[in-house]
Curated annotation (Swiss-Prot):
SUPFAM superfamilies: Alkaline phosphatase-like. This is Phosphoglycerol transferase I. It is found in: Cell inner membrane. GO terms for biological process: glucan biosynthetic process. It comes from the Bacteria. Belongs to the OpgB family. The keyword Electron transport does not apply. It catalyses: a phosphatidylglycerol + a membrane-derived-oligosaccharide D-glucose = a 1,2-diacyl-sn-glycerol + a membrane-derived-oligosaccharide 6-(glycerophospho)-D-glucose. The chain crosses the membrane at residues 1-21, 26-46, 77-97, 108-128. GO terms for cellular component: plasma membrane.
Length: 763
């Protein structure tokens, strides 16, 4: 209803101003601004809904604001371009419509009415309401009854007898198992669900609606609310450090805790969370690539589910034979939005719905087959009698190609338990939520029946039963949950440990690189990883007077305030205000001590604008003073006009990438010397090793031969035609995810370049 009211007010404002208000620059600007805000809000809602399926929520703040480079970005490029073009077109059309009667005299009453209607359209819009609620949830003081409902369990299980296998199915909500709605979609896993304890009403609450949040909720009994935004959990060195979670209790009770997934463990800080809470054995894409049968068999996120579950089965066998008490957690990925992936070993590779193939449903049907096969192996083993198997979704499906069909059903998360020691077949329709999962498992294993805000669904009463308004109640508890982080509120002194690549202050530790916004009562960490925006782009969003501490590789800040460090890959610390004074300090000791020193200076807006503009220069447009092309820093020497076919900088250099261009092209501002030596320090990737690699300047071509290790080769060129472009053609670019950013399409690697130098020859 609010959508219709909001749109009606918007339309009325446009029509009244266009036909009645007449000419007035101020009223035109004010009305266009408010109407434009309405458009931006609704496009933001549309874009957020495209990713989350639930509008503007904590998942948007946590995962999408700074994490798109790790979220399968290639699949969202076209929708993103469409949104930008649509926004431009709408603004242009709005301006044209509002100025239709610009030659008529101004009418104050109609102008005021149009502006009020525009303001009303913004206020009534769902996007404004959702953002307002998010802002309120950040600023509340908390709820006095939080302490009464938050309960810490005993740190041990008195007499543990059962091993635990816990399977998180990515977005594998219970709705998929409705055979009437989706016939024969999940026959294998659905049959296993019906053999166990099936909890049919597992609700999704705020702060539990994306993977790491679902894991925190199910293991710690609390939503993931944090004192920072974006993907900062990937940067912290501990995760809810004061809380007792399921992994802590298992470890204290003699369990060895294992976690296996196909994606990179660093994504969203899963490695930090698990290591902080009892898990000593973690396997992700980096750890598995040396042990899996085919390390090249991967999707955009990591290894396929059949590979991951095969490794999980091997680990289950190994641990069961050892006689050691253990827990084995695993997380699938093939059902990740927007389309999912199909493992090659599946029999169920295609599922048609609504008269046509549906990729998301196909991925679900394939993944559930793999999960069921893994469970059936355990059930057929002699160790099943000592094992509890848990299968749950990490969260409800986000906006995938099946989402509109899911939304027609009563949606719930998946949670069922198969007990090898005590077979029990029952569907339990108790009202519950994801936070109850850990408490229920703990109860089955012989521990307490409560965990944080979670309660066992076998012997306790869920918060979802106690509070009819549990979603609002959860948001009211948000400040109380944030306080559980024990996060510092000030930063005066800090220490940088170069061996561990961490910064420590006020009892907290963070991974480097890191940007910090420092105010009187708050310190906000903003990390950089493969999954967040570069720190300089984040810093460019700071206000002129915002205090910052920026710890990064020296060359990244050198172009602003320390040109002498333009080629240094050491750590540097910069601090100050963008509109005031800044200092850059070189970290020259293994353990380096620093102090914050923010001077109360007059803000120079011209300086601020210059700093922001420089911070926003894209990597390929950065230029530095050097007599050679150094590939492990961003940009190129001043003599280079442009270049293409080259991937991003890495610690050693850069790969050629045929996805960006079949050839490596480096165009110089001026013609290359008549006679020169080309000194190339590089290596080859895969089948490009020991193959002739053409290197061209104008009409002259030389051959470069590289191995898999870095070597330096000198080629001699004559350049009678005054050519200004160097071309290198890798003979056989290889499609691979090696060293790739999680969620990105594979790169096509040819040669790895460390340095290229042009040396003029005499004569």
């Amino acid at each position: 209803m609010s959508e219709l009211l909001s749109f009606a007010l918007f339309l009325a404002s446009v029509l009244i101003y266009a036909w009645k208000a007449g000419r007035n620059t101020w009223w035109f600007a004010a009305t266009l601004t408010v109407l434009g805000l309405f458009v931006v809000l609704n496009i933001t809602l549309f874009a957020s809904d495209y990713f989350t399926g639930a509008g503007i929520n904590d998942a948007v703040l946590y995962t999408l604001t700074n994490s798109l480079t790790g979220a399968g970005v290639s699949k969202y490029i076209l929708p993103g371009i469409g949104i930008v073009l649509g926004l431009t077109a709408v603004f242009g059309a709005l301006g044209w419509i509002l100025r239709r009667r610009r030659h008529h005299p101004h009418h104050f009453g109609y102008s005021l009415l149009a502006l009020l209607l525009a303001l009303g359209s913004v206020d009534a819009s769902p996007a404004f309401r959702q953002i307002t609620e998010l802002v309120k949830s950040q600023s509340r003081d908390g709820d006095p009854d939080f302490a009464a409902y938050y309960k810490e369990p005993s740190k041990t299980i008195p007499d543990p007898k059962l091993n635990l296998v816990y399977i998180y199915g990515e977005s594998l909500e219970r709705t998929y198992f409705d055979n009437e709605a989706f016939p024969d979609l999940t026959p294998e896993l659905g049959a296993l669900k019906n053999e166990g304890l099936d909890f049919s009403h597992t609700q999704q609450l705020p702060g539990t609606d994306y993977t790491i949040a679902g894991m925190v909720a199910s293991q710690c009994g609390i939503p993931l609310f944090a004192p920072f935004e974006g993907n900062a959990s990937a940067s912290v060195s501990s995760f809810f450090p004061q809380n007792i979670c399921l992994g802590d209790i298992l470890k204290n009770s003699g369990y060895q805790n294992y976690f296996v997934q196909g994606a990179n463990l660093r994504f969203a800080g899963k490695d930090v969370f698990l290591k902080s809470h009892g898990f000593d054995h973690l396997y992700g894409s980096e750890e598995l690539k040396s042990v899996v049968a085919d390390p090249h068999y991967r999707n955009d996120w990591g290894f396929y589910d059949d590979t991951v579950l095969d490794e999980a089965w091997k680990k289950f066998e190994e641990l069961s034979r050892s006689g050691q008490r253990f827990s084995l957690f695993t997380l699938t990925v093939d059902t990740h939005h927007p389309d999912g992936f199909i493992s090659r070993t599946c029999n169920r590779k295609k599922y048609d719905f609504d008269g046509k193939p549906n990729q998301s449903f196909s991925a679900v049907s394939c993944s559930q087959e793999n999960i069921a096969a893994f469970i059936n192996k355990i059930k057929a083993s002699p160790w099943f009698k000592d094992t509890v198997i848990v299968v749950s979704s990490d969260h409800l499906a986000m906006n995938n190609t099946a989402w509109k069909y899911l939304n027609k059903q009563d949606r719930n998360n998946l949670f069922f338990v198969i007990r090898g020691d005590k077979p029990q077949q029952e569907t339990l329709a108790v009202k519950r939520n994801t936070m109850d999962n850990g408490a229920t498992v703990l109860d089955i294993l012989g521990g307490d029946n409560y965990l944080g805000l979670g309660r066992s669904s076998l012997s306790g009463q869920s918060m979802s039963e106690i509070f009819l308004n549990i979603k609002e109640k959860t948001l009211a508890w948000k400040p109380d949950i944030i306080r559980l982080w024990k996060f510092p509120k000030e930063m005066k002194e800090f220490t940088i440990d170069q061996q561990k690549n961490i910064i420590a202050f006020s009892g907290s530790h963070f991974r480097l690189p890191l940007l910090l916004r420092v105010s009187d009562k708050r310190v906000e960490p903003l990390p950089e990883s493969e999954y967040s925006a570069p720190l300089r782009f984040q810093l460019a969003d700071f206000a002129p007077r915002d205090n910052f501490v920026w710890v990064d590789r020296c060359y990244k800040m050198a172009q602003l305030w320390a040109p002498e460090l333009a080629l240094s890959t050491d750590w540097c610390v910069s601090q100050g205000q963008l509109g005031g004074q800044q200092i850059v300090q070189h970290v020259d000791k293994t353990t380096w001590q620093g102090k914050t020193a923010f001077k109360d200076t007059v803000i120079d807006m011209a300086r601020y604008k210059g700093n922001v503009d420089t911070l926003k220069i894209v990597d390929n447009d950065i230029r530095y003073k050097a007599d050679s092309f150094i590939f492990n820093v961003a940009g190129a020497p001043e003599e280079v006009k442009q270049f293409s076919g080259i991937s991003r900088p890495e610690s050693w250099g850069r790969w050629s990438n045929a996805q960006l261009g079949d050839e490596v092209k480096i165009e110089y501002k001026h013609p290359l010397p008549k006679k020169f030596d080309l000194v190339i320090t590089a290596k080859a990737y895969g089948n490009n090793a020991s193959r002739p690699i053409p290197v061209r300047v104008g009409n002259e071509e030389q051959t470069l031969v590289l191995g898999n290790e870095v070597t330096t080769t000198t080629l001699h060129f004559d350049n009678p035609t005054d050519a200004d472009t160097l071309v290198i053609v890798p003979p056989e670019p290889v499609s691979t995810n090696e060293g790739n950013i999680l969620g990105h399409s594979p790169r096509k690697l040819g040669i790895g370049m460390v340095e290229i130098k042009v040396v003029e020859r005499e004569g």
